[in-house]
């Protein structure tokens, strides 16, 4: 799973509303949440699962949902 997502990091994106949700839900000060998400995905301690049409990237504190066909970051939240 992780290899697929890593191979397609250049396709990772979100909508304007998704950007606002990520910044709010994860308390990000990062101007570009997609850039932050790319770094999060690349961390060795993150895990990835695939359920139905989404990838779920997570560690002990954060979960990101990413559409598996469009690579759109749908939402992120703290556990």
Give the role of each language-model region.
Residues 1-79:
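Ribonuclease/tRNase effector modules and their secretory precursors
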């Amino acid at each position: 799973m992780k290899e697929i997502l890593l191979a397609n990091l250049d396709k990772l994106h979100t909508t304007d509303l998704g950007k606002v949700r990520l910044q709010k839900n994860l308390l990000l000060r990062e101007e570009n949440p997609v850039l932050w998400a790319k770094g999060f995905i690349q961390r060795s301690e993150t895990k990835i699962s695939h359920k139905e049409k989404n990838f779920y990237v997570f560690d002990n504190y954060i979960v990101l949902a990413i559409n598996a066909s469009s690579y759109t970051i749908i939402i992120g939240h703290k556990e």
